[in-house]
């Protein structure tokens, strides 16, 4: 269209409104906003306990590599809603493209197993396949570290995840990027604002080192905003206070409305 306008004395339109539209699409895409989906880790384990009879690492690994999908029946309301959420994610991605939903956040992540539980449910819903002939990962998985104890275990959780060859394959299918969300509110309620900020700072450095060890790009998602106790304050000051190397070309932050 632009070439046609330029060839037919339409420079004002081609270099004006049309050019601005093209630049906007290049920058932001055609999707209004990419959504994140978030669920508590215990909900995933509850669903898997009903379907598989457990959610240990051995059970999850076996199910992740199974070609067949177990029959999901007689689920309680919360487990049924959880699985329907994954099915809805697949439907939206298939209809509108991969930009509509990119990240699935697991709140109250205490171990790598909490993330793998969500991965297995995603596999059941058709969002993940690790079969060599047709491997794909339509969404990425984001551990949310909220309490001081989880922040102090951040490096161990991420290292265990990335050391799992099946999970690492998912990361590679997603462009070699691992996102981790850091919670400001719960850690502040746990130990106060000073300890919370210091533990978040240390967690970022440890996560950075683990990402370098495994040769993946780290994208930190800061769940900050609102009051000072929830990490609020000027964004510029927050950015320049981040540890060296923790921004690997990408960063995410919540913006309170």
What are these regions (language model features)?
Residues 16-19, 80, 84, 113-116, ...:
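Generic alpha-helical secondary structure signal
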Residues 58-63, 68-119, 128-142:
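C-terminal amphipathic alpha-helical interaction region
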Residues 14, 33-36, 42-45, 114-116, ...:
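Short helix/loop capping segments that flank catalytic or ligand/cofactor-binding pockets
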